[in-house]
């Protein structure tokens, strides 16, 4: 799938990788995925989620470039 589409699929694969790493850091799969979709919810749920939320924003800015 990754090789199939170098453009859009490439962005999705990187995004999924970031979300997976954030989930491992939070050690909560359920909250990790929901926090990834809603950054505000992640910050409100707990301090541990605020750290990966920052990394997600940084990766998103790089993807936008």
Curated annotation (Swiss-Prot):
Domain of life: Eukaryota
Biased composition annotated in UniProt, kind: Low complexity: 29-38
A GO CC term assigned to this protein in UniProt: perinuclear region of cytoplasm
Subcellular location: Nucleus; Cytoplasm, Perinuclear region
Record bears the keyword Magnesium: no
Predominant location: nucleus
Composition skew (Polar residues), residue ranges: 18-28, 56-65
Disordered: annotated span: 1-65
Any GO BP annotation: rhythmic process
Keywords, alphabetical: Biological rhythms, Cytoplasm, Nucleus, Phosphoprotein, Repeat
PTM comment: Phosphorylated with a circadian rhythmicity, probably by the double-time protein (dbt). Phosphorylation could be implicated in the stability of per monomer and in the formation of heterodimer per-tim.
Quaternary context: Forms a heterodimer with timeless (TIM); the complex then translocates into the nucleus.
Function: Essential for biological clock functions. Determines the period length of circadian and ultradian rhythms; an increase in PER dosage leads to shortened circadian rhythms and a decrease leads to lengthened circadian rhythms. Essential for the circadian rhythmicity of locomotor activity, eclosion behavior, and for the rhythmic component of the male courtship song that originates in the thoracic nervous system. The biological cycle depends on the rhythmic formation and nuclear localization of the TIM-PER complex. Light induces the degradation of TIM, which promotes elimination of PER.
Protein name listed in UniProt: Period circadian protein
UniProt organism field: Drosophila mojavensis
